[in-house]
């Protein structure tokens, strides 16, 4: 193997440095010390579903088309997958140069496209995904004694020990699958990603022992991969960093409602709540206006008026282990009654998904039932931007480092799919929520948040450790990896090879021509996103 790329979700120096000092991750510590390492600036927004495609294509979301865990068609939505990534991935570029690849567990790679090599998909794939080549998953399971995309028991009730065991088992499966496939296919390029280094901060965020265990398991697998695959060059990268919140929860749709931009409903026409994601049966359903509300519906309606919506009720029930029991007996219509949400068709502007970090205008002729006239678009958007730039926390601090029109952040053929206004929270210390809970500010629902800076490191052949990483950006990873293999970067790439490798120049590659987007088929993916706080 000539080049190995190791992806470690959410890895950053505030997390790694204490682990290095404690001797918990000796393999990573040695790689960082023997080669070159530094901060890697992530993109906007710095979240898994968009950032990993940016890393493995070298282009911004406006060029590859994925901005969120969700993709939208008018007011309807689906979970993103690889068919929504409309640019060539690293392994597809290498295929066109006659080089083979093995790719394991990289997010947003299902369903795989044809290339020379092997691919087992990662996050956002269903549990039994199609792999490349066909039948590969069965071979992997037979070879290593089982394989799952997600940690065993992830959707069931687990205690701390079982959760940590799940992290270890997930790391083992990634490492053993990668080594088996590398031995079988003998690729020039290998890419393996470890996801639970992020998940641990959502599930056990204050548990230093759990964090150490998750990273130690990954470090052990990296060591085994290096020993068995003996790559000439190793690159390590993350999609973003992670850290504690030090601010507030800012409820964007509450802000918009209070200023007359957003209208609300307790029926359909919006994103699903906690309850509907778990039940997997409310997409854009319409409320039945002719039916008499049940006593439970009326009670939940009253609760919603004082801020107890089903989203937070779901979190409270889950905390005491009653969420599944409640969902078994609470009728769908009662859930709808207790879920106050933005009505997309009736609103001028709304946050459709918190992971998107932005606001979408409901424009006539663009959205199915748009209310903002095209000639008013610029004025409405500028007014929104000015108002949001002035928002202050209860402590008098600015909520946002920047509030920008989308074209100031993204460029490319898919900018039209992005939010119209992009929000950059101050130091990413504020939790942006799409929920309607009465007050614009509250305590963050989660203790940790993605941060703007991850890591990049490299060691081995062709790496000039004295050159440093410069102002390394997420978009630079793909052209850097190509340079280690002597392959020119695509002219469409927004990144450039980092200073520690010798650039090979650029080349015009064929335009991307993909198949129509595939619909998500495993609603357990939605539940996982909901459990992690990515869907509210």
Task: Name each model-derived stretch.
Residues 13-15, 48-49, 64-65, 109-115, ...:
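Short catalytic/ligand-binding loop motif for oxyanion handling, primarily in non-cytosolic enzymes
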Residues 12-185, 261, 281-291, 299-326, ...:
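Active-site-proximal alpha/beta segments of enzymes that process anionic O-linked groups
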Residues 395-418, 469, 486-517:
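Polar, surface-exposed loop/tail segments
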Residues 15, 163-190, 195-236, 240-244, ...:
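A long, amphipathic alpha-helix that forms part
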Residues 70-83, 87-93, 231-233, 240-428:
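Secreted, luminal/periplasmic, and some membrane-associated catalytic domains
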Residues 1-16, 31, 55, 94, ...:
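Beta-strand elements within well-structured catalytic alpha/beta cores of enzymes
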Residues 518-536:
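Short acidic, low-complexity intrinsically disordered linear motifs used
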Residues 424, 429-478, 482-486:
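Low-complexity, glycine/alanine/valine/leucine- and proline-rich hydrophobic stretches
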């Amino acid at each position: 193997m000539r080049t190995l790329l190791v992806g470690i979700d959410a890895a950053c120096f505030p997390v790694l440095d204490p682990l290095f000092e404690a001797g918990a991750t000796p393999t990573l510590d040695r790689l960082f010390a023997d080669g070159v390492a530094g901060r890697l600036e992530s993109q906007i927004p710095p979240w898994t579903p968009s950032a990993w495609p940016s890393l493995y294509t070298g282009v911004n979301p406006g060029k590859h088309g994925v901005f969120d865990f969700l993709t939208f068609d008018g007011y309807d939505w689906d979970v993103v997958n690889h068919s929504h990534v409309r640019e060539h991935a690293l392994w597809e570029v290498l295929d066109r140069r006659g080089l083979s690849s093995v790719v394991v567990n990289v997010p947003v790679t299902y369903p795989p496209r044809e290339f020379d090599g092997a691919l087992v998909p990662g996050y956002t794939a269903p549990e039994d995904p199609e792999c490349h080549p066909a039948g590969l998953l069965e071979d992997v399971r037979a070879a290593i004694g089982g394989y799952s995309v997600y940690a065993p028991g992830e959707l069931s009730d687990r205690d701390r020990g079982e959760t940590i065991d799940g992290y270890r088992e997930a790391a083992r499966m990634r490492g053993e699958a990668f080594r088996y496939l590398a031995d079988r296919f003998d690729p020039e390029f290998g890419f393996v990603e470890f996801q639970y280094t992020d998940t641990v901060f959502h599930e056990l965020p204050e548990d230093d022992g759990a964090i150490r265990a998750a990273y130690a398991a990954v470090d052990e697998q990296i060591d085994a991969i290096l020993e068995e695959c003996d790559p000439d060059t190793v690159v390590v990268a993350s999609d973003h960093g992670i850290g504690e919140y030090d601010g507030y929860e800012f409820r964007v749709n509450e802000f918009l409602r209070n200023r007359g931009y957003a209208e609300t409903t307790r029926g359909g026409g919006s994103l699903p709540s906690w309850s509907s994601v778990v039940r997997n049966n409310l997409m854009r359903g319409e409320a039945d206006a002719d039916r008499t509300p049940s006593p439970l519906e009326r009670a939940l309606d009253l609760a919603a008026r004082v801020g107890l919506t089903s989203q937070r009720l779901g979190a409270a029930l889950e905390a005491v282990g009653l969420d599944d029991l409640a969902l078994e007996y609470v009728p769908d219509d009662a859930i709808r009654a207790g879920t106050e949400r933005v009505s997309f068709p009736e609103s001028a502007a709304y946050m459709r998904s918190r992971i998107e970090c932005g606001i979408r205008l409901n424009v006539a002729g663009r959205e199915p039932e748009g209310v903002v006239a095209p000639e008013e678009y610029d004025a409405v958007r500028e007014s929104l931007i000015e108002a949001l730039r002035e928002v202050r926390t209860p402590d008098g601090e600015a909520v946002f480092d920047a509030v920008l029109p989308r074209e100031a952040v993204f460029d490319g053929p898919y900018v039209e799919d992005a939010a119209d206004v992009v929000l950059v929270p101050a130091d990413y210390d504020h939790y942006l929520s799409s929920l309607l809970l009465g007050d614009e500010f509250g305590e963050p629902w989660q203790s940790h948040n993605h941060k703007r800076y991850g890591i990049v490191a490299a060691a081995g052949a062709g790496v000039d450790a004295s050159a440093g990483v410069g102002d390394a950006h997420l978009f630079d990873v793909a052209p850097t990896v190509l340079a280690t293999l002597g392959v020119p970067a695509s002219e469409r790439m927004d990144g450039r090879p980092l200073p520690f490798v010798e650039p090979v120049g650029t080349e015009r590659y064929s335009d991307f021509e993909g198949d129509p987007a595939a619909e998500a088929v495993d609603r357990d993916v939605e539940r996982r996103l909901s459990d992690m706080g990515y869907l509210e």
